[in-house]
Amino acid sequence: MAVKSLIRKCLFPAAGYGTRFLPATKAMPKEMLPIVSKPLIQYGVEEAMEAGISQIGFITGRGKRAIADHFDTSFELEHQIKGTSKEKFLDDIRYLMDNCEFVFMRQREMLGLGHAILTGEPMIGNEPFAVILADDLCAKPTEGGERALSQLVALYERYQCSIVAIEEVPADETHSYGVISGDEIAPGIYQIKDMVEKPKP
């Protein structure tokens, strides 16, 4: 069940080309790659809902129409499977469509992640918001714990400042990630002092 949150809006930057996933992403957005029975991006929207967020903004680019189509009604498909055993396979997506508000914004130029997020400013205004990168799937904890976004929302409500999820990476792979330095102020919680994008090992 979703919780009431100070953060009501979430952006999904989804305008990139998905070159790391070629050739699978040549004709399909990486956000629509299937994991078991759902596309990656649907897992992200479900995680946002679990964190109490119902206003979802997608920052898209050319060739990403499949994302909008996925979160919309397909009358032909619905008619074709109505009354059959396959109808239940649409229950999850129907629930999201009934309980979320979706906004689609076009990033006209590929100027990076920061620019993609800035493209969402008309929807966000001055409110606190979350950002989910759909190709970074965070699995649901196996023993009843909260998913990553719910943890981040709780930290925001506690500290009232920007919150970033971090993870340890091997030193020889830092050239592929943003890296932080900071002080641990509580178990697993760091106050960031500096952040560097893709430093050399």
Describe the role of every protein-language-model region.
Residues 37, 107-109, 197-200:
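Residues that form or immediately flank small-molecule/cofactor binding pockets and catalytic motifs
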